[in-house]
Amino acid sequence: MTEAAALIILAGALVIGLGAIGAAIGVALLGGKFLEGAARQPELLPMLRTQFFVVMGLVDAIPMIGVGIGMYILFALGA
């Protein structure tokens, strides 16, 4: 394996791994703020829950895009 091929594999792994770590941190912060808001104003719980799930879905879409780009890097460029 050449050095360039090894760096391409490393780049693909970093895209997938760091995207997943970033999304996990984002969902954790989002969940904490959701619980704070729900505890502070329980009457707003339905609105907060809807916004929470919409934003959580958007945050979770980022690692899926990263997986697609990482797989492209690994299989299309790494071959």
UniProtKB/Swiss-Prot annotation:
Q: How does it sit in the membrane?
A: Multi-pass membrane protein
Any one Gene Ontology molecular-function term assigned to this protein's record: lipid binding
Q: What does this protein do?
A: F(1)F(0) ATP synthase produces ATP from ADP in the presence of a proton or sodium gradient. F-type ATPases consist of two structural domains, F(1) containing the extramembraneous catalytic core and F(0) containing the membrane proton channel, linked together by a central stalk and a peripheral stalk. During catalysis, ATP synthesis in the catalytic domain of F(1) is coupled via a rotary mechanism of the central stalk subunits to proton translocation.
Q: Which organism is it from?
A: Cellvibrio japonicus (strain Ueda107) (Pseudomonas fluorescens subsp. cellulosa)
The residues annotated as site (Reversibly protonated during proton transport) are D60
* Annotated compartments: Cell inner membrane
Which family would the database say this protein is a member of?
Belongs to the ATPase C chain family.
Q: Which CDD domains match?
A: ATP-synt_Fo_c_ATPE (cd18185)
Location, primary (coarse class): membrane
Q: Which gene encodes it?
A: atpE
Q: Which Pfam families match?
A: ATP-synt_C
The protein here is known as: ATP synthase subunit c
Q: Which GO terms describe its cellular component?
A: plasma membrane; proton-transporting ATP synthase complex; proton-transporting two-sector ATPase complex, proton-transporting domain
